[in-house]
């Protein structure tokens, strides 16, 4: 028998023996969806003692089986997105102090980055836990007049989804006016945020705006926060941000983490609407992202 035939026969026998020893493995790659949910009572206070049995999750109207459930203070990748336009000059010091206060009240293992924006966004501090680096970035004032909030949020989402070391991703945006300089459409920003399970919180310092412009800004901020499970705040005076920042930090650290494997595993690119219900007399409101897009890039997990 030729040498090549002898080698082939030996290899066949070895593989046959190996397959006889080892059972066949069947692998599954079920797609998971991770939700970060906030429960509130009628006074807007957090409800933090709910059991798994109180929750029901629906996707496109179909009840889903909850695979895991916990309330845990997990570290987050946190982005601070701060308006640096000319109209913010007198407010920046107060906003910077409140932003640093939020970081100090957050999980010590958080990683934080800062994007300042006027007519264009600027990444002024990459992920860090060093207060001095954050303070330096927040002190940067290079105002050019315009407000490109949507572009800044898109920059922040792209940054956090590509560089984050923590599973949970949160952005806090502070602005004092309606967006007048962005190229990025609002619906695109919302879609990308939902797709990457980024929670967005917004502080709109809009008291100096005309009613029409303030209304436009509110509609945009509310659309962002409602779609992602965050919250919008509209203080009448910048001093109120000292109260709002701790509220945001407290909420981020006291959310429920609910995971389910969709009964519809098709990756057809369609939008899957999510609705969470809580059966508890003390709960008035439950917030989480409103849905996600079933695309191939979410094959293993939608928002983990």
Regions from the language model: what does each represent?
Residues 1-10:
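Bacterial N-terminal signal peptides that target proteins for export
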Residues 20-304:
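Scaffold/interface architecture of coatomer-like assemblies
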Residues 10-20:
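Hydrophobic h-region of N-terminal signal peptides that target proteins for export
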């Amino acid at each position: 028998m030729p040498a090549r035939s002898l080698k082939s026969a030996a290899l066949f026998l070895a593989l046959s023996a190996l397959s006889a020893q080892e059972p066949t493995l069947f692998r599954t790659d079920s797609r998971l969806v991770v939700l970060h949910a906030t429960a509130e009572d009628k006074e807007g206070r957090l409800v933090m003692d709910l059991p798994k049995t109180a929750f029901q999750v629906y996707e496109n109207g179909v009840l889903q089986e909850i695979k895991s459930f916990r309330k845990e203070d997990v570290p987050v990748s946190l982005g601070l997105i701060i308006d640096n336009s000319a109209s913010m000059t007198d407010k920046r010091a107060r906003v910077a102090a409140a932003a640093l206060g939020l970081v100090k009240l957050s999980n010590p293992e958080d990683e934080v980055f800062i994007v300042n924006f006027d007519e264009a966004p600027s990444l002024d501090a990459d992920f860090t836990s060093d207060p001095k680096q954050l303070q330096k970035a927040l002190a940067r004032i290079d105002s050019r007049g315009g407000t490109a909030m949507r572009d800044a949020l898109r920059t922040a989402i792209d940054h956090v989804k590509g560089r984050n070391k923590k599973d949970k991703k949160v952005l806090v945006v502070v602005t004092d006016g309606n967006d007048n300089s962005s190229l990025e459409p609002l619906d695109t920003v919302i879609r990308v945020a939902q797709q990457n399970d980024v929670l967005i919180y917004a502080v709109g310092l809009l008291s100096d705006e005309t009613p029409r412009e303030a209304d436009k800004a509110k509609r945009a901020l509310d659309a962002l926060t409602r779609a992602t499970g965050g919250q919008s705040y509209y203080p009448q005076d910048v001093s109120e941000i000292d109260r709002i920042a701790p509220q945001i930090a407290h909420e981020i650290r006291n959310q429920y983490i609910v995971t389910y494997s969709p009964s519809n595993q098709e990756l057809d690119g369609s939008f899957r609407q999510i609705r969470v219900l809580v059966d508890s007399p003390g709960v008035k409101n439950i917030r989480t992202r409103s849905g996600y897009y079933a695309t191939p890039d979410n094959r293993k997990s939608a928002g983990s």
